[in-house]
Regions:
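A short beta-loop-alpha structural element at the N-terminal edge
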Residues: 2-16
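A short helix-loop-beta-strand connector motif used in the catalytic cores of GNAT acetyltransferases and
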Residues: 42-56
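Conserved beta-strand in the GNAT
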Residues: 56, 62-71
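Conserved acetyl-CoA binding element of GNAT-fold acetyltransferases
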Residues: 79-92
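Conserved beta-strand-loop-alpha-helix junction that forms the acyl-donor binding cleft
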Residues: 107, 117, 121-133, 151
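Conserved acetyl-CoA-binding loop of GNAT-fold acetyltransferases
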Residues: 135-146
Length: 152
C-alpha cells in the first residue's frame, strides 16, 4: 500500500471516495439533498493548490482511503491559522489494514512541517464513529471538544 499526497490526477477517484464517505456516515446533512459534486471538485482543487492537505492511500492502482484538511482562521485569533481535518475515510475492506494509521502519520508529518514553517498554529482531527478504535492520545493529540448535532 502506498500513502501519498493527492494530486490533480486523482480527482475522479477522490470524488468517488468522498461519495462513499457521504453514503457511509450518518450525517443529518443528507436532508439537504444530493452531494454537491461541483463544490467538492472546487474544494479539492483549492486544497491541493495550497489551502490544505489531501492524502490518499492507494493499493493496486485504486484509492482506498483519503484525508482532506483545510486551513482556516482561528475564531479567536484571526491572524492565526488552524488546519482542520474535513474527513478521514477508508473503504470498509481496507479498514483492518494500516491505511488509516499511515495516512494519519503522513498528515501529522505534513501538519508539523506547516507548524514549523509558521503556516499554521495547530491542526485537528475529528473522531467519528468509524474511527472509534483509533487511540488519538497515543498519536499525540489531546481531546478538545465533542460535537453534537441537532436540526435538519
Amino acid at each position: 500500500m502506498i500513502v501519498r499526497e493527492a494530486n490533480k490526477f486523482d480527482l475522479d477517484k477522490v470524488i468517488d471516495l468522498v461519495k462513499n464517505f457521504y453514503d457511509a456516515v450518518e450525517l443529518d446533512l443528507k436532508n439537504y439533498g444530493d452531494l454537491d459534486l461541483e463544490y467538492v471538485n472546487k474544494l479539492y482543487h483549492h486544497i491541493i493548490l495550497g489551502a490544505g492537505i489531501a492524502i490518499v492511500a492507494e493499493k493496486d492502482d485504486q484509492l482506498v482511503g483519503i484525508i482532506l484538511a483545510l486551513k482556516n482562521a482561528n475564531i479567536f485569533y484571526p491572524d492565526k491559522t488552524v488546519l482542520n481535518e474535513l474527513l478521514i475515510y477508508v473503504e470498509p475492506e481496507h479498514r483492518k489494514t494500516s491505511a488509516c494509521y499511515r495516512m494519519l502519520s503522513m498528515y501529522q508529518k505534513l501538519a508539523d512541517k506547516m507548524v514549523s514553517n509558521d503556516e499554521i498554529t495547530t491542526y485537528t482531527v475529528t473522531k467519528t464513529e468509524h474511527l472509534d478504535q483509533i487511540k488519538f492520545e497515543k498519536l499525540g493529540y489531546r481531546k478538545s471538544e465533542e460535537v453534537w448535532v441537532a436540526g435538519a
